[in-house]
């Protein structure tokens, strides 16, 4: 998978400034995962957010236009090859239908929104090795009957 040029530029500027996505939360008032999605063009910024981000990264104002354009959703091959991303694919391959069944038992026939959605990543200390804790929260949308 090739990383878009704008993504490479944004990531390099962030690295050059010694910033993390968590550092940018205070500047933009958005979650670190949402900000990372901006970098990868999976989300778009408001004009004000784009100005703040470009300023924080020390980039030319010409990047504002790119950050406010409609995003391109979905990046990379259908079956991901990056090991970390592949684990999520594998998790859904193994647990996707079981998760679906449990959601339907609790909510009924419908889906979890990825639009009215938040995702948090936390680090949990564990004596056997640090753990990754991911919390997804999406609005339940029942299927309409007509």
From Swiss-Prot:
Q: Which GO terms describe its molecular function?
A: cyanate hydratase activity; DNA binding
Enzyme Commission numbers on file: 4.2.1.104
Active site at: 87, 90, 113
GO terms under biological process: cyanate metabolic process
Protein task? Catalyzes the reaction of cyanate with bicarbonate to produce ammonia and carbon dioxide.
Q: Which family does it belong to?
A: Belongs to the cyanase family.
Q: Which NCBIfam families match?
A: cynS, PRK02866.1
What is the protein's name according to its record?
Cyanate hydratase
Specify the species.
Nostoc sp. (strain PCC 7120 / SAG 25.82 / UTEX 2576)
Q: Which gene encodes it?
A: cynS
């Amino acid at each position: 998978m090739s990383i878009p040029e704008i993504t490479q530029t944004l990531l390099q500027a962030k690295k050059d400034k010694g910033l993390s996505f968590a550092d940018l939360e205070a500047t933009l008032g958005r979650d670190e995962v949402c900000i990372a999605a901006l970098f990868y063009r999976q989300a778009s910024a408001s004009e004000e957010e784009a100005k703040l981000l470009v300023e924080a990264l020390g980039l030319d104002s010409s990047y504002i236009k790119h950050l406010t354009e409609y995003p391109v959703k979905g990046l990379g091959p259908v079956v991901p090859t990056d090991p970390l991303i592949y684990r999520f694919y594998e998790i859904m391959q193994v647990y996707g239908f079981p998760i679906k069944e449990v959601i339907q038992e609790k909510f009924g026939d419908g889906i979890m929104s990825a639009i009215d959605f938040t995702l948090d990543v936390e680090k949990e200390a564990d004596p056997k090795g640090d753990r990754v804790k991911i919390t997804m929260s999406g609005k339940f949308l029942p299927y309409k009957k007509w």
